[in-house]
């Protein structure tokens, strides 16, 4: 999955549940950026594999079916 698609779906999920969402592409090198959801943050790369998506959601404290 491409990062843009993942972030779009994650932003939609957060908005529907009233969670704060932010993405900052400046926090990271190359194709990496920082996504923050309700005070929890993690680094996201450009190309995401299914296992990496599950890890990101776990780090953000979100359920596996969030996106």
Residue ranges and their predicted role:
Residues 1-29, 34-67:
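Basic nucleic-acid-binding interfaces
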